[in-house]
Amino acid sequence: MAPKKAKRRAAEGSSNVFSMFDQTQIQEFKEAFTVIDQNRDGIIDKDDLRETFAAMGRLNVKNEELDAMIKEASGPINFTVFLTMFGEKLKGADPEDVIMGAFKVLDPDGKGSIKKSFLEELLTTQCDRFTPEEIKNMWAAFPPDVAGNVDYKNICYVITHGEDKEGE
C-alpha cells in the first residue's frame, strides 16, 4: 500500500506544477527547455548550460556557476523539474523583478543595455516570435542609442507599468 501512496503523491506533485500555468505558458516553458537542452536528451545538464551561455555570447562561465545552477534542482532537470523550479521562483515574485531578471541574463556585464541586433534576433527566432510589424513598433517605442544598444530597464518598466518613466 505504501508504494502506491508514494506514486500517487509523486503524480499529484507533478500535476500541481502543471496547474500553476496555463497551456500557453507551459508551451513557452517547453520551448525554453528545448532551447536549453542542447543535446536533446530531455535533461538539462552542465554541458547544456555551458552551450546555452556560449550561444548568448558568454563564453567564460565558471564551473562553479554552472554547478550552483544544477544544484538548485533536487535531481536531474527534466521538463517537470524545470517547470517546478520556475513555478517556485515565480510564486510571489514581482513581475517587474522577473522581467528584469530575464533581461539581466542577456546582459552578463550588467551594462543595463543589450544590442538591438541580438534582441531582435531573439524576438524573431525564439518562442512567441515577433512579426516585422511588431519589431518596427518596438523600435519606434524604444529606439536604440547611436551605438545600437537598447535600454532594457525602460522596456521592463513599460511592460509592467504600461507607460514610460517620467523624466527619462
UniProtKB/Swiss-Prot annotation:
Q: What is an annotated GO biological process for this record, any one?
A: muscle contraction
User: Which SUPFAM superfamilies does the record match to this protein?
Assistant: EF-hand
Q: Which residues form the EF-hand domain?
A: 24-59, 94-129, 130-165
| Alphabetical list of Pfam families matching this protein | EF-hand_6 (PF13405)
GO MF, any single term: calcium ion binding
| Keyword Repeat on entry | yes
Q: Can you cite an annotated GO cellular component?
A: myosin complex
Modification N,N,N-trimethylalanine occurs at: A2
PROSITE patterns, per the entry: EF_HAND_1 (PS00018), EF_HAND_2 (PS50222)
InterPro entries reported in the protein's UniProt record: EF-hand-dom_pair, EF_Hand_1_Ca_BS, EF_hand_dom, Myosin_RLC
Keyword annotations from UniProtKB, A to Z? Calcium, Metal-binding, Methylation, Motor protein, Muscle protein, Myosin, Phosphoprotein, Repeat
Question: How is the protein modified post-translationally, according to the record?
Answer: The N-terminus is blocked. N,N,N-trimethylalanine, found in other myosin light chains would not have been detected in the N-terminal tryptic peptide in PubMed:7358336 because it would remain trimethylated and ninhydrin negative after hydrolysis.
Which positions in this protein are listed as binding Ca(2+)?
D37, N39, D41, D48
Any S-S bridges, and between which cysteines? none
Q: Which residues carry this modification: Phosphoserine?
A: S15
Q: What does this protein do?
A: Myosin regulatory subunit that plays an essential to maintain muscle integrity during early development. Plays a role in muscle contraction.
Assembly mode: Myosin is a hexamer of 2 heavy chains and 4 light chains.
Q: What else is known?
A: This chain binds calcium.
Protein name stated in the entry: Myosin regulatory light chain 11
Q: Which organism is it from?
A: Gallus gallus (Chicken)
Identify the gene encoding this protein.
Answer: MYL11
